[in-house]
Amino acid sequence: MAKKVIGEIKLQIAATKANPSPPVGPALGQKGVNIMEFCKAFNEKTKDMVGFNIPVVITVYADKSFTFITKQPPATDLIKKAAGIAKGTDNPLKNKVGKLTKAQVLEIVEKKLVDLNTNDKEQAAKIIAGSARSMGVEIVD
């Protein structure tokens, strides 16, 4: 018989930087999860994604055990890295802060496709391009 789920926790944690301090500690502590066990497992699993915030979904069971799923870094993080910018603009219509080529957009699509709500690469490219435009990043050929 399957274990009874008592909760699900969604967090964004910097890769290899999970530690018992907020926000990780309090979120897991409320559910009775062994915080250090999670931190060690998360840091080990994300050691090849350094420099990104990683969305994670933690499922907590009645016996205080847990499983977690890591997702791909947010599209905005991937766009910022590809465009070489620190942050987007507050006014994307007037201020352009960087440029991405269509090839770079397709690279981002390859990474993010599993997390997007489409399986079509053309549609996924439109989603990523829209996110980039919202940040003030131009898409060029």
UniProtKB/Swiss-Prot annotation:
GO CC annotation: cytosolic large ribosomal subunit
Function statement: Forms part of the ribosomal stalk which helps the ribosome interact with GTP-bound translation factors.
Family: Belongs to the universal ribosomal protein uL11 family.
Name this polypeptide is given: Large ribosomal subunit protein uL11
Pfam family of the protein (one): Ribosomal_L11_N
Alphabetical UniProt keywords: Methylation, Ribonucleoprotein, Ribosomal protein, RNA-binding, rRNA-binding
NCBIfam families in the cross-refs: L11_bact
Reported modifications of this chain: One or more lysine residues are methylated.
Biological process according to GO: translation
KW Nucleotidyltransferase (keyword) present: no
The species this protein was found in: Campylobacter curvus (strain 525.92)
